[in-house]
Amino acid sequence: YENYASFALEERMAKTPDAVYKLLDQIWTPTLSKAKEELADINAEIKKDGKTFTAEGWDWRYYADRAKKAKFDLDENQVRPYLKLENVRNGVFYVANKLYGITFTQLDNLPLPHPDAQAFECKDKDGSHLGVLYMDFFPRASKKGGAWCGSYRSQTYKDGKKVAPVVTVVCNFTKPAAGQPALLSADEANTLFHEFGHALHNLFKDVHYYGVASVPRDFVELPSQIDEHWAFEPE
């Protein structure tokens, strides 16, 4: 091998360093152009405040939200009433059923990590058991921040028989006041679809050897990013 990259990529999707550089070259020019356009919009918002500094990384989110509102008349808070957490959750289940024929049924007889969490049995289109999915959406003192998908038990084989996975999707959405629905931003709804894509990957796995994802490293985010594309499809 000419170098370590050539060795490491041989069994991954990219196959060769040249393929990696080709992809990076394809996206670099349009991405840089768009970033410069967004930076100009952000600096324009800064000037509206009578400030003279140029935006740094830590200014980006605040001024980008202002720029979106000014340029597109988009206020994220006005989107939230259309994205009730329960509806978005049912939406990810609906998409999975339409695409793969699988179903999710809430279980009330399993231990939960917290009363806010929920557990669902996932069945394949033939009615066979695929696994159990936990959903734990709200922050609390014992949780780290962010969103992720994990497993309490990974799919495996024991004594020649398949052992179904127990998967968990964890988020930190704002918990609503008592009697009020939890409302998501568009980005949070997209996050739920993303993590659910990882959950589908774990539920569908059929492997004999344990691995973080049981696939090449550059495939790991593919199921989640594919699922994101369904978040705002009108159908």
Where are these regions (language model features)?
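Active-site-proximal, well-structured secondary-structure segments within enzyme catalytic domains
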Residues: 1-175, 229-235
